[in-house]
Amino acid sequence: MPRIQVLDIRGSKESVGSTPHLRAAILEGLLKPPGSRTLPSETLYDEVGLKMYNDGMKAWAEWYYPVEAERQILERYGRDIAKLFTTSAKGKAVLIELGAGSLDKTSQVLLSAAEITRTTGPMNNIAYYALDLERGELERTIGRLQEVIGDQIAGKISTAGMWGTYDDGIRVIEKNELELEPDIPVHILFLGGTIGNFSKQDGDVAFLKSLPLDHKRGDTLLVGMDRHKSADAIERSYGFAAAKDWIMNGLKVSGRVLTGDEGLFEIGNWERYAKYNEELGRYEAGYKSQKEHALKISEGVDITFLKDEVVLVMFSNKYTDAEMDSVVDSAGLVKNGSWMDEKAQYCLLSLRANNGPV
């Protein structure tokens, strides 16, 4: 097996995802008035949380429709999608996946790209980088990727990790820290419907605008968006058993980051909150206080939670077709192509800057 290369691209120890930054974000959310308190979703993705999430997705893929829908799209339309990964005059390109997770879905993307790529010698034409917050999980998942499809992509696609945040990845592209030749296009993968974790028609647009897509060299973005559907269907799909343990692990992470004590948030004082918010068109998850109780974080910092108060830790937007079009247009992007699963539950979009080549 090839050596697993992981680039440390973290901008600084104070960057997003670092303990000092995460502690500040946790405090900021908890010091809001009751009824509007939050915990950052990063608390769900420590090494333990990532493994719980990835294992849960595999075990409950039948119920958690985004996994099956995205897999179906990539298997059915993978070659069409890969054909939109433009290359340089020498046939080279870079793929960077933001928030790579388990890489299961990525395998099909890379297999499709390998099928259509041409080789000009012993060097790999396409370089794939998986970006994520946890180095250990990156090494584990890239190692697994190499075990499963390494022989099929050998000589065509190289694989490596990027240890850092979305912002770090964006900086690497903007400042060309990979030292790419000017005409080598960069194709960003943002799969899993993760764009729905930003505020709708606001944070999602701002994030897409922040992506440095260079139209002159043919950069693209492949993004997954979850389509609007009934509340019952959504709540049922998120109701798998592992989801509770995964969400509750966020309280342990928050306690550890705040004071070093994973038991700071007594689990008995909380239950998992999970509900589809019809008004905002999003699934919400977090914690519901079982009784009024106080939490002492440090000298002079005490927080009282009310009975039945909800603290949100994550949400996932579900988009109507009109909302998808609005987000894309507002971000200054245009579609190269779009694909849906057979039940029309989920959509993959290939996007480029609106002044890019047709």
Swiss-Prot record:
Residue runs in coiled coils:
none
Temperature effects?
Answer: Optimum temperature is 25 degrees Celsius.
Instruction: Cite the EC number.
Output: 2.1.1.-
Domain of life, per the record?
A: Eukaryota
| Database matches in Pfam families | Methyltransf_33 (PF10017)
| Single Gene Ontology BP annotation | methylation
Q: Which PANTHER family match?
A: ERGOTHIONEINE BIOSYNTHESIS PROTEIN 1
What is stated as this protein's family in its record?
A: Belongs to the methyltransferase superfamily.
Its recorded reaction(s) are: L-tryptophan + S-adenosyl-L-methionine = N(alpha)-methyl-L-tryptophan + S-adenosyl-L-homocysteine + H(+); N(alpha)-methyl-L-tryptophan + S-adenosyl-L-methionine = N(alpha),N(alpha)-dimethyl-L-tryptophan + S-adenosyl-L-homocysteine + H(+); N(alpha),N(alpha)-dimethyl-L-tryptophan + S-adenosyl-L-methionine = N(alpha),N(alpha),N(alpha)-trimethyl-L-tryptophan + S-adenosyl-L-homocysteine + H(+)
Q: What does this protein do?
A: Methyltransferase that catalyzes iterative L-tryptophan N-methylations to produce L-abrine (N-alpha-methyl-L-tryptophan) and N,N-alpha-dimethyl-L-tryptophan. Also catalyzes a third methylation to yield L-hypaphorine (N,N,N-alpha-trimethyl-L-tryptopan), an agonist of the phytohormone indole-3-acetic acid. Can also N-methylate the non-native amino acid substrate 4-hydroxytryptophan, but the ability to incorporate trpM into a functional psilocybin biosynthesis pathway is indeed thwarted by the inability of the L-tryptophan decarboxylase psiD to use N,N-dimethyl-4-hydroxytryptophan as substrate.
Q: Which InterPro entries match?
A: EgtD_Methyltrsf_superfamily, MeTrfase_dom, MeTrfase_EgtD-like, SAM-dependent_MTases_sf
> What is the species listed in this Swiss-Prot or TrEMBL entry?
Psilocybe serbica
What Gene Ontology molecular function terms does this protein carry? methyltransferase activity
> What gene does the UniProt entry assign to this protein?
trpM
UniProt keywords, alphabetically: Methyltransferase, S-adenosyl-L-methionine, Transferase
Question: What enzyme class is recorded for this protein?
Answer: transferase
> In the record, what lineage is assigned to the organism producing the protein?
Eukaryota, Fungi, Dikarya, Basidiomycota, Agaricomycotina
**What name does UniProt use for this protein?**
L-tryptophan methyltransferase trpM
